Regions:
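Glycine-centered loop/turn motif at secondary-structure junctions
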Residues: 39, 223-226
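Generic preference for hydrophobic/aromatic residues in regular secondary structure cores
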Residues: 43, 112-113, 188, 194, ...
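Conserved catalytic cores of phosphodiester-cleaving nucleases, focusing on short active-site segments
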Residues: 54, 138-161, 175-208, 214
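Nucleic-acid nuclease catalytic cores
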Residues: 180, 197-201, 225-235
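Short, charged, amphipathic alpha-helix that recurs within catalytic cores of restriction-modification
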Residues: 214-223
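Nuclease catalytic cores
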Residues: 1-170, 211
Length: 235
């Protein structure tokens, strides 16, 4: 299927045509193909990648705020010293709360423009959450997933990261980020942005693969925030 993307390697693989094991696809790619055929969901294997990338792009100004004391001690630092800690939020609470409130009120075009502008003006700058040359961090993919979540859900997720500290919750995020495209909207600069009317997150489990504590945490978090999430068992 031409809509499949995956960043995985060295994993158990499946044949996409007859459901038998082969060297054709990982379990995540198998699942992507399944959701495409069954429900017309398009998507990416973006485990622990997509959400931190959107978090970083949308909060870039606050992350690199040089008014916070002692967090930048070298011009070679790629991120502030407290970035992964709970103190990151504590040290910038007022500015972060203001930015989250602003994002939460975004219209679709405002969300697109924010992600797009940061992505294109900061492209190439070393940081811990966006690998510019990796296709999973493709600008159009990140924008589509951002649209699929919508501003309010993104802010709810970001608040969880900020209050918990990224270090403690940066793993365990679902494997698949899926969305449905309902036709095409007008051409906007480089891309056609489809009307996206739903999002689904999926944790993929093969035989004998069990949920980790962080995976359970994120599944519970998404459920509590009204985000469609499920576990897919592949045998």
């Amino acid at each position: 299927a031409d809509s499949l993307y995956s960043s995985s390697s060295g994993r158990r693989k499946y044949n996409l045509t007859d459901d038998k094991f082969s060297e054709t696809a990982t379990v995540e790619e198998f699942a992507l193909n399944y959701y495409l055929k069954q429900d017309n969901y398009r998507g990416v294997h973006g485990e622990n990648v997509v959400i931190p990338a959107l978090y970083f792009l949308l909060l870039w100004e606050e992350i690199y705020d040089d008014e916070v004391p002692l967090v930048f001690q070298s011009k070679y630092q790629a991120f502030p010293l407290d970035f992964f800690e709970k103190d990151f939020y504590i040290n910038r609470k007022s500015k972060l709360d203001n930015k989250l409130e602003k994002i939460q009120k975004y219209k679709k075009d405002q969300l697109i423009n924010h992600i797009k502008t940061t992505y294109e003006t900061k492209n190439g700058i070393k940081n811990p959450c966006v690998e510019w040359n990796s296709y999973i961090y493709n600008e159009e993919i990140l924008i589509k997933i951002g649209i699929a979540f919508g501003p309010q859900k993104l802010v709810e997720i970001f608040r969880v990261i900020l209050t918990q500290g990224l270090k403690s919750v940066k793993t365990g995020m679902p494997d698949l980020f899926l969305w449905k495209e309902n036709g095409k909207s007008k051409y906007k600069e480089k891309f056609y942005y489809a009307e996206i009317d739903s999002i689904k997150l999926v944790e993929v489990k093969s035989v004998n693969d069990k949920l980790s504590d962080n995976q359970k945490f994120w599944l519970k978090t998404f459920c509590e925030n009204g985000i469609n999430v499920e576990v897919l068992h592949i045998k």
